[in-house]
Amino acid sequence: MTHPSRCAHPSTAGILGEVGGDIWAGLADQFVDGAYASVKGLVRTYVLHQQLLEHLPAPPASVLDVGGGAGHQSFPLAEAGYEVTLLDPSQVMLDKARQRLQRLPDETQRRVRLLEAEGENAEAAVDGQHFAAVLCHGVLGYLEQPEPLVDQLCRCADAGGVVSIMTGNAKAMAVRPAMERRWEDALAAFDARHEVGVLGVPGRAETVEEVSDLISNRGVEPVRWYGVWLFIDWLEFGGTELDPSDSGQAAAIAAVELEASRRDPYRQLSRVFHLLGRKRPN
């Protein structure tokens, strides 16, 4: 299952059982400055970036990042020359995005637009604009009904455009409790869909097949799916601490994780998966 400590975050109105309020206001520092600064955060950003580049058209194509948080995934695309619109419902997270954006070159800043809106209202928020790529990473797992959001993702993609979704892998739910030696929880997790994340936020997982059906029914042809992280997860839950300042080690881990994300059986054991599809012609 995806967790807010490691991934993008959901619409506050759709979190399982949560209604109203910006619950991410109290988690933003830990989310932005903690999780993404860890080796796992660095690996996640690198692996997803490389996977995206295998499918995106060349810059300056337009990219919409729905639930994009502080821009950890889409700002590197802006640095690579893409025109990025980051949409997020949390004012606090958007403030974090602005702070990070100010540290980037002026040319990159001019390629980024920040919008405060729920993902379920994405099409209206962007005034009906269509994008060469629509990203939604770590959001679906916090919605009891993902269909309205998926509908918006697919509607915002241009014909031939890419839809990129990362969410929790329902077929790997036992990994975390087993690595934490919570054996009763691990046994129950084989058939579970819900869990409470490390920050106490509840969520659910999907299968690749289920999300593939969701986008296919909305005019987007599934193209390929990947894992995202595997070994780094096992190290963390096994109690191994890694130094994010050791750039050589982080790069070596990222290279291994990228290769594992493409291959069976490794990708099947990743606790999250990354599905990419392409919008069919109108």
Model region roles, listed by residue range:
Residues 2-59, 72, 76, 93-96, 162-190, ...:
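Conserved class I S-adenosyl-L-methionine
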Residues 135:
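A conserved beta-strand element that flanks and buttresses the S-adenosyl-L-methionine
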Residues 202-219, 225:
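Short alpha-helix
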Residues 64, 72-122:
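Class I SAM-dependent methyltransferase SAM/SAH-binding core
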Residues 147-162:
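A short glycine-rich, Lys/Arg-flanked "PGG" loop and its adjoining helix->strand segment in the class I
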Residues 138-139:
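Short catalytic micro-motifs in class I SAM-dependent methyltransferases
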Residues 224-282:
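Conserved Class I S-adenosyl-L-methionine
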